[in-house]
Amino acid sequence: MNMKLKTLFAAAFAVVGFCSTASAVTYPLPTDGSRLVGQNQVITIPEGNTQPLEYFAAEYQMGLSNMMEANPGVDTFLPKGGTVLNIPQQLILPDTVHEGIVINSAEMRLYYYPKGTNTVIVLPIGIGQLGKDTPINWTTKVERKKAGPTWTPTAKMHAEYRAAGEPLPAVVPAGPDNPMGLYALYIGRLYAIHGTNANFGIGLRVSHGCVRLRNEDIKFLFEKVPVGTRVQFIDEPVKATTEPDGSRYIEVHNPLSTTEAQFEGQEIVPITLTKSVQTVTGQPDVDQVVLDEAIKNRSGMPVRLN
C-alpha cells in the first residue's frame, strides 16, 4: 500500500457488458470460454466538486483502491473539477471455478456466481489490516446468516482499543453503530462477510480480518446468498487470459503488502507471475514492452498484450 493510501485511511472517517441491479453490478458470463467481461468508463469530475474520491467510487460500485490504481495521482480527498477519471469496470474473471462466492483479496473484489443464472455479481470489499490479514487459499462455506449481528471483541481487540483510549463493551449490540453493520454472513474460523458503520474503508485494509462491504451490498448478499454457499478466498494480483479470438490480456493489481515498509510505500511490493499467467505472457506474439509497462503501472485494468 502506498503512502497516499495509508494517509487516506488514517484521515478517513448503457455500459456494454453489464448492468446495475439495485446496488450490484451484474455481468453476463461469456459462453465461449472468455474470461474478459465488462467495459471501462470515463467520467469527468464536475466543476466546483466538493466530494472525495470515495463518493465517485461508491457511485460506480468501485473500491477506493481500484479507483486509485486506475487513476494514479488523483487527489483522493477532493478531486478537482475537470479531472478525467477512469472507472475500471472491465475485468478478467479469476482463474478458478465459477461457483458460489470467490473473494480475491489482492484486487479487493468479491465475485458471486448465483446458481443457474450464468451471471457474476462483482462487489468491492475492505479486508484485514497488515498483521490482521484476511485469509487466502481457503475454501469454506456460508455457515449461517444474521440480520442485526452483535460484535464480541477478542481479548486482543479489547487491549488494542483500550490502548487507543476507546474501551469496548464485552458485546457491542446490534444497530447502526456496530462495526459489523446490519447484516453478516458467517463463514467459519471466527470470520464473517459483513457490513460497516463507517462511510469509508471499501477498497482499503481496515478490518480485523473479516470481509467488509458497503451496507447496500451486504444487504443484497444477505437476501440472495443461501446458507451452504461455497466461499473461496484467493490472492491473485495478476490475472491473464487468452481470449477465443486469440487476443491476450493481463490485469495487474498491486499485491498486498507483507511488511510495514511496503505498507508505508517505502518499498515496492514485488510481483511474481504464476505459471498460469506465464502461459499467456510467454507466447511469442506478446509485446514485451507493453507487458513490462502493464506490470510497472499496475493499473488494475486489463491491457491487451498482442
Swiss-Prot record:
The active site is at 194 (proton donor/acceptor), 210 (nucleophile). GO terms for biological process: cell wall organization; peptidoglycan-protein cross-linking; regulation of cell shape. Residues 1-24 form the signal peptide. Its main location: periplasm. CDD domains: YkuD_like (cd16913). This is Probable L,D-transpeptidase YbiS. It is found in: Periplasm. One of its GO terms (molecular function) is peptidoglycan L,D-transpeptidase activity. One of its GO terms (cellular component) is outer membrane-bounded periplasmic space. It comes from the Bacteria. Keywords: Cell shape, Cell wall biogenesis/degradation, Glycosyltransferase, Hydrolase, Peptidoglycan synthesis, Periplasm, Signal, Transferase. Its EC number is 2.-.-.-. It comes from Escherichia coli (strain K12). In vivo a sulfenic acid can be formed on Cys-210, which probably inactivates the protein. This disulfide is subsequently reduced by DsbG and DsbC. Disruption phenotype: Simultaneous disruption of erfK, ybiS, ycfS and ynhG leads to loss of covalent anchoring of the major outer membrane lipoprotein (Lpp) to the peptidoglycan. Complementation with ybiS restores most of this anchoring. Pathway: Cell wall biogenesis; peptidoglycan biosynthesis. Residues 99-234 form the L,D-TPase catalytic domain. Belongs to the YkuD family. PROSITE patterns: LD_TPASE (PS52029). Changing residue 210 to A: Protein is unable to form sulfenic acid adducts. Interacts with DsbG. Pfam families: Ldt_C (PF17969), YkuD (PF03734). Responsible, at least in part, for anchoring of the major outer membrane lipoprotein (Lpp, also known as the Braun lipoprotein) to the peptidoglycan via a meso-diaminopimelyl-L-Lys- bond on the terminal residue of Lpp. Can be oxidized in vivo, its reduction depends preferentially on DsbG, although DsbC is able to partially replace DsbG.
